[in-house]
Amino acid sequence: MNNLTLEKKAQTRNLRKTLQGIVIRTSPKTIMVEVETAYKHKLYAKRFKKRKKFNTHDEKNLAEVGDFVKIAECRPISKTKHFRLVEVLQKKGEI
């Protein structure tokens, strides 16, 4: 492959979805992260909060319940895991 195709692949890899949320459950090498998004109704302009839970791969078991983390989309690791832990942004006790 030439350098141009490698650069294009790297660019598409960087376009993967990244989310931030709170860890609500842990188990070996897996965490469940709850991500909250806010949106506005198109017609009535009322604001809503939507919560979604993602099973996330945590290879080194770095995250604990209550931590604020950053996760990124990746290849399917199992039937329900399609995200991986990028970093722990804030520990539970820190402000």
UniProtKB/Swiss-Prot annotation:
It comes from the Bacteria. The keyword rRNA-binding applies. One of its GO terms (molecular function) is rRNA binding. The keyword RNA-binding applies. It holds the Pfam family Ribosomal_S17. InterPro entries: NA-bd_OB-fold (IPR012340), Ribosomal_uS17 (IPR000266), Ribosomal_uS17_bact/chlr (IPR019984), Ribosomal_uS17_CS (IPR019979). One of the primary rRNA binding proteins, it binds specifically to the 5'-end of 16S ribosomal RNA. Belongs to the universal ribosomal protein uS17 family. NCBIfam families: PRK05610.1, uS17_bact. Part of the 30S ribosomal subunit. PANTHER family: 40S RIBOSOMAL PROTEIN S11 FAMILY MEMBER, SMALL RIBOSOMAL SUBUNIT PROTEIN US17M. This is Small ribosomal subunit protein uS17. It comes from Mesomycoplasma hyopneumoniae (strain 7448) (Mycoplasma hyopneumoniae).
